[in-house]
Amino acid sequence: MALPNQQTVDYPSFKLVIVGDGGTGKTTFVKRHLTGEFEKKYEPTIGVEVHPLDFFTNCGKIRFYCWDTAGQEKFGGLRDGYYIHGQCAIIMFDVTARLTYKNVPTWHRDLCRVCENIPIVLCGNKVDVKNRQVKAKQVTFHRKKNLQYYEISAKSNYNFEKPFLYLARKLAGDGNLHFVESPALAPPEVHIDLAAQALHEEELQQAANQPLPDDDDEAFE
């Protein structure tokens, strides 16, 4: 869903809402996609910036109109107008700030109150930073709510496309859909230790086979 003053397209397009605490890297993440950054539009009445992000798939071009809060979440809850007609969502937290993960259930509740039964991806951002506070095995919320989870690093472009590919497959109802061309991304601002991150990803896989804790707080003990 584009803004009233924004160009529409004749290929499939979807409203993607991105939520999470302030400072988790939502805007940085969206701005990696250079053509979307060039064509963004701001809507002051809702306090939102909408970035049109195009991806090229084996089934043709698709567009996500990424609704970014432009920092409004720092002043309390978001208005329902931000969520209405949302067709998919990303909930983002910062793996270096434990509170941002503890607030994920609140964001999920607010989102699902307005947007029922939409595909949602949970993203743990800033995995390039050394002093990680939320370990991979401590991330369990997605398993409780049947969400997809990815570890990402917006500033290094690590796993940038994965949330979009997952959502595209869900929205198209085609598990074989794939991207045939990479979007133009801003050059990495930082470099990620891929060997260390591979260990986190392995920890995540092992945790998926463990029983869920009764309470998320238990995971941090």
UniProtKB/Swiss-Prot annotation:
- Positions of the UniProt region annotated as Switch-I: 40-48
Residue positions binding GTP: 21-28, 71, 125-128, 153-155
Name the Gene3D superfamilies on file.
P-loop containing nucleotide triphosphate hydrolases
Q: Does the keyword Cell membrane apply?
A: no
What GO molecular function annotations does the UniProt record carry, in alphabetical order?
Answer: GTP binding; GTPase activity
TM region(s), chain numbering: none
Please explain the role this protein plays, according to its UniProt record: GTP-binding protein involved in nucleocytoplasmic transport. Required for the import of protein into the nucleus and also for RNA export. Involved in chromatin condensation and control of cell cycle.
Q: Which GO terms describe its biological process?
A: protein import into nucleus; ribosomal subunit export from nucleus
Main subcellular localisation: nucleus
Record's keyword terms, sorted: GTP-binding, Nucleotide-binding, Nucleus, Protein transport, Transport
Name of the protein in its database record: GTP-binding nuclear protein Ran1
Q: Where in the cell is it found?
A: Nucleus
Q: Quaternary state and partners of this protein? A: Found in a nuclear export complex with RanGTP, exportin and pre-miRNA.
GO CC terms in record: cytoplasm; nucleus
The record's region (Switch-II) falls at 71-87
